A protein has these predicted regions:
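Hydrophobic beta-strand scaffold residues
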Residues: 38, 60, 104-105
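Short acidic/histidine-rich motifs immediately flanking catalytic phosphotransfer sites
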Residues: 56, 75-80
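A short, aliphatic-rich alpha-helical micro-motif
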Residues: 10, 72-76
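Hydrophobic, well-ordered beta-alpha structural blocks that scaffold small-molecule cofactor pockets
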Residues: 1-53
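ADP-ribose/adenylate-binding Rossmann-like module
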Residues: 80-113
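Conserved SAM/SAH-binding loop
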Residues: 63-70
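Structural recognition of alpha->loop->beta junctions
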Residues: 53-59
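Short, ordered loop/turn segments at secondary-structure junctions
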Residues: 43-45, 65, 109-113
Length: 113
């Protein structure tokens, strides 16, 4: 078995979601149910993410993800990273940066990354 299923206690932990579409929204909703503190970085954002941020549920950064965001001043170091951009190149950058920082990363719908 090459891949190992993993459960994380994310209550009160910081999670970075990269991507702002419908898939990212579903991940954010699930992470919030788990008690995670969620930061989203995306060039464009689903309106439901904006609404959630307006209620103080998540932190949003409307811009392109850069690998330095993982250790950026002003952003909490995440316990987990979710790459859900729909852009394989951006997801690959996120996966490599997470690996270099020793942070688990889930790239949505791409086991190879």
């Amino acid at each position: 078995m090459r891949y190992f299923p993993l459960f994380l206690d994310l209550d009160g932990r910081d999670v970075l979601v990269i991507g702002g579409g419908a898939v990212a929204l579903r991940k954010v909703e699930t992470l919030r149910l788990a008690g995670a503190r969620v930061t989203v970085i995306a060039e464009s954002l689903h309106e439901a993410l904006r609404a959630l941020a307006a209620r103080g549920g998540i932190s949003l950064h409307e811009r392109r993800f850069e690998s330095r965001d993982i250790e950026a001043p002003g952003l909490a170091r995440p316990r987990l990273i979710i790459a859900a951009t729909g852009d394989r190149d951006v997801n690959a950058v996120a996966a490599r940066a997470a690996d270099a920082a020793g942070i688990p990363c889930n790239v949505v719908d791409d086991r190879e990354l």
